[in-house]
Amino acid sequence: MDTKTLIASEIAKVVPELEQDAIFNLLETPKNSDMGDLAFPAFSLAKVLRKAPQMIASELAEQIDESQFEKVVAVGPYINFFLDKAKISSQVLEQVITAGSDYAQQDEGQGRNVAIDMSSPNIAKPFSIGHLRSTVIGDSLAHIFAKMGYKPVKINHLGDWGKQFGMLIVAYKKWGDEAAVQAHPIDELLKLYVRINAEAETDPTVDEEAREWFRKLEDGDKEATELWQWFRDESLLEFNRLYDQLHVTFDSYNGEAFYNDKMDEVLELLEAKNLLVESKGAQVVNLEKYGIEHPALIKKSDGATLYITRDLAAALYRKRTYDFAKSVYVVGNEQAAHFKQLKAVLKEMGYDWSDDMTHVAFGLVTKGGAKLSTRKGNVILLEPTVAEAINRAASQIEAKNPNLADKEAVAHAVGVGAIKFYDLKTDRMNGYDFDLEAMVSFEGETGPYVQYAHARIQSILRKADFTPSATTTYSLADAESWEIIKLIQDFPRIIKRTSDNFEPSIMAKFAINLAQSFNKYYAHTRILDDNSERDNRLALCYATATVLKEALRLLGVDAPNEM
């Protein structure tokens, strides 16, 4: 139990008028540490108890069990709590040393599934930095949900269907070179895609021809299907090479095409419930009662189905297949209206489990303030970017530690980790401007900075030849140690907040805070001095490294032992 929860529970025992959660939210940290570690303002009880806040604080301070604290005193209208730092540090260190990487493991999920729709790049298009956000946010949330006791199911809902395949088939038949595509599939397909889109802007017949080829594809035309399958296979080979570099795996690659034969059932269900309304020849579902002005367009006047029809089929399939406790869609915030419609249509169909679906939206990645666009050829491709990040990391490692063993593996961990961490430390609803130099820096709020703090601690532990014993009591009460202890103790709550808010930036900021606190401690404390505090300080180092490594793992970032 963290100290804030402990204090809230002790106050709740003597204040039945307030719920423990309400007390927890009222607790404050005094500006001056001489006034205690946490304080409870009695103002909120004045009306209920019909007493002055000062009197309430004085009376309650007398009633609270002080055995858990150094002291409890009333100061004006506040009850100030002074924590027993030695006792708490001993408990926290024991918990981390005993549990190791399982420290802060929770059982909220009880093994239930969480479906995570993530990454989902478009076939025959390059994997760009724009796809990175969905990939790394989804991967981090999968780790977080597992830490909360859920079983994550990572779904790569590939963009392997749609009019763009009509465009690509037209382009390939006009200008395609089979040998060139086989040699450099994504590069060649991207060139074809950009070229055909440029031509379509001045020649309206291109769109008509593309629509015709896509209709053939929908009807199972042999030539169209073979080309589509080839584009898909070549793209997946390239994507999987990148996923291997990012250390990201999936449980399902069922993309849009997988649901082609599952949409008729959706239409039948909607018709059976009389939810479909004709509008200008199209079939729609009205959602005004959900505060959604525009109806959900299910079927166009030419009989073609839309994304939402496919997503309805996917939602039904996932619920039946995984019986998820939560289903999250890690998709850009420009799709917010689509997901509101999706949930509302499912609700109209009578599926209350739609309440368990969440659109985990995120902002755009820009370059020099400009929006990225595959169609216009303005992209930052991930593969060369990862290679450049690894090279930059290797240069810095060579300068800092030229005799390091496994330099290539460490450079990979640092370079890839730098890109992931920079993305994840940003509040997901905010975008960020891509800056590789800032990402790979060992200074500032970066992945390499946190990784280096972990490696520094491992170096200290190796030098001291120290391994903590689960049967030894370690304890610290100095101010510098206390800042670290408080953060380590807060780790379980940070994990839960990250999970509840679908917000990996909470975890990334925690990792930065812990690394900064340790570096400050390292600068002011002679850790290896041979005195009575040496083992206590080393135990703190061990616990800090354990939690730093686990925080990075939950972000999908490796923590090398040497850098």
From Swiss-Prot:
State the GO CC annotations. Answer: cytoplasm
Q: Which reaction does it catalyse?
A: tRNA(Arg) + L-arginine + ATP = L-arginyl-tRNA(Arg) + AMP + diphosphate
Signal peptide range in chain numbering: none
Q: Give the SUPFAM superfamilies listed for this entry.
A: Anticodon-binding domain of a subclass of class I aminoacyl-tRNA synthetases, Arginyl-tRNA synthetase (ArgRS), N-terminal 'additional' domain, Nucleotidylyl transferase
**What Enzyme Commission number(s) apply to this enzyme?**
6.1.1.19
Look at the named UniProt entry and state the broad enzyme category this protein falls under: ligase
- Which Pfam family is an annotated match for this chain, by its short name? Arg_tRNA_synt_N
What does the record give under GO molecular function?
A: arginine-tRNA ligase activity; ATP binding
GO process annotations (BP): arginyl-tRNA aminoacylation
Localization (cell): Cytoplasm
Keyword field: Aminoacyl-tRNA synthetase, ATP-binding, Cytoplasm, Ligase, Nucleotide-binding, Protein biosynthesis
Per the record, the major location class is cytoplasm
Which intervals of this chain are the motif 'HIGH' region? 121-131
NCBIfam families per the record?
argS
Q: Family, per the entry?
A: Belongs to the class-I aminoacyl-tRNA synthetase family.
PANTHER family for this protein? ARGININE--TRNA LIGASE, CYTOPLASMIC (PTHR11956:SF5), ARGINYL-TRNA SYNTHETASE (PTHR11956)
State how it assembles: Monomer.
Q: What is this protein called?
A: Arginine--tRNA ligase
Q: Which organism is it from?
A: Streptococcus pyogenes serotype M3 (strain ATCC BAA-595 / MGAS315)
